[in-house]
Design a protein with these regions (language model features):
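Transmembrane beta-strand segments of Gram-negative outer membrane beta-barrel proteins
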Residues: 37-53, 84-86
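Transmembrane beta-barrel strands of outer-membrane/channel proteins
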Residues: 47-53, 90-96, 131-137, 165, ...
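Sequence/structural signature of outer-membrane beta-barrel proteins
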Residues: 52-58, 93-101, 120, 136-145, ...
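Extracellular loop and loop/strand-boundary signature of outer-membrane beta-barrel proteins
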Residues: 57-63, 98-104, 148-154, 220-225, ...
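Residues that define the transmembrane beta-barrel architecture of outer-membrane proteins
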Residues: 65-71, 107-111, 157-163, 227-233, ...
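Residue-level signature of outer-membrane beta-barrel architecture
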Residues: 75-79, 119-121, 169-171, 237, ...
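Repeated loop/turn-to-beta-strand initiation elements of outer-membrane beta-barrel proteins
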Residues: 84-86, 123-128, 174-177, 246-249, ...
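Outer-membrane beta-barrel "beta-signal"
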Residues: 274, 319-334
């Protein structure tokens, strides 16, 4: 009897221990019962494609068939922890147009990266002590169509870099932010020597003498400058408002002036866009971009009255304008 009781007690103890162990293991391994730790990172990924197509078949009034496409991408990664904020944004655009009996032509080309680190005194403030880095260039060669023999721009020709420190007011709820830096270094890169020799995009042009053997050729005494550095004041602003249901008005403005060279002459880059959202995947947009840089000389064609040859001469700085109207598909993903 004692042996039976002892055996029964041992079995009950083992059974109880087994049940407890299973409960512990089940509690430990069940992912649904684990606490969710919020991430300090937020991200945004949006890609879009605008397509415009016109076709004419036996159209008596005349016309040229064409098709255009514009790819757009916007990506962002933002890290916020306590009083620290680090935001990174990447914007990319590339557009092509094909008309009947003409070559494929580029209509838009841009890649821009913006990185901003900010520190605020308390987590309730919208004011940050900030450091900002901007970089923008293009993907492929640009031409003055129909002339495609010599590119007028290339990858890293030009490229613009901004690096500075200042203050930023960032309001996520109202989707707006303003940045002011009294100390910003601006670097213009023209890493194509032919374009640098011409003084393209504000770099110092090269000096040459005509080739005595072939007067049409040039002997470069001093090559053009590939890098231009400026030091000045930078202001950037961004606002996005819903002006009507599913109608959004977005503005981006950048102003820069150099302390050392023509202080007060302001470089302007203003981009405004009106988005009309049909649904989560279809959107129409109207955009205008205006650029003015006092160091960039526009060109105009002139004809020599004696020889009849055509050439281009500097025509002073001019405002640059681009207007876009498109309807296309958008897709956002995590």
């Amino acid at each position: 009897m004692k042996l039976f009781r002892s055996t029964l007690l041992i079995l009950l103890f083992v059974f109880s221990a087994t049940i407890s162990a299973q409960s512990i293991i089940r509690t430990t391994l069940d992912p649904g019962e684990l606490p969710v730790i919020p991430s300090n990172w937020t991200k945004k990924n949006v890609v879009g494609l605008d397509i415009t197509q016109i076709a004419f078949i036996n159209w008596n009034a005349g016309g040229t068939s064409s098709i255009s496409g514009l790819f757009k991408g916007e990506f962002s990664r933002t890290y916020i922890k306590k009083n620290n904020k680090w935001s990174n944004e990447l914007f990319a655009k590339y557009g092509l147009n094909k008309q009947e009996e003409t070559e494929l032509r580029k209509t838009d080309d841009e890649v821009k990266f913006i990185s901003t680190y900010g520190f605020r005194k308390d987590s309730l403030s919208n004011w940050f002590y900030s450091a900002k880095f901007n970089f923008n260039t293009q993907f492929t060669n640009g031409y003055n169509y129909p002339n495609i023999d010599k590119p007028i721009s290339r990858l890293f020709a030009p490229a613009y870099l901004f690096l500075g420190a200042g203050v930023e007011n960032s309001n996520k709820e109202k989707d707006r932010k303003f940045y002011f830096s009294p100390v910003t270094l601006k670097t213009t890169l023209v890493l194509d020597q032919d374009l640098a020799n011409q003084g393209a995009f504000g770099v110092r042009k090269g000096e040459f003498i005509p080739d005595p053997v072939n007067p049409d050729d040039k002997i470069w005494i001093t090559p053009g400058q590939k890098v231009k550095t400026e030091f000045g004041i930078l202001f950037e602003g961004h606002m996005k408002n819903e002006v009507y249901k599913n109608v959004f008005f977005e503005n981006r403005l950048q102003l820069y002036t150099d302390y050392l060279h023509k202080f007060g002459n302001i470089d302007i880059d203003y981009d405004t866009r009106l988005d009309l959202v049909v649904n989560a995947y279809v959107k129409a947009n109207i955009g205008i971009r205006v650029i003015y840089d006092d160091d960039i000389q526009s060109k105009k064609d002139v004809v020599d009255p004696v020889t009849g040859t055509e050439s281009q001469v500097d025509n002073g700085p001019r405002a640059q304008l681009r207007q876009v109207l498109g309807v296309g598909l958008v897709y956002a993903f995590k």
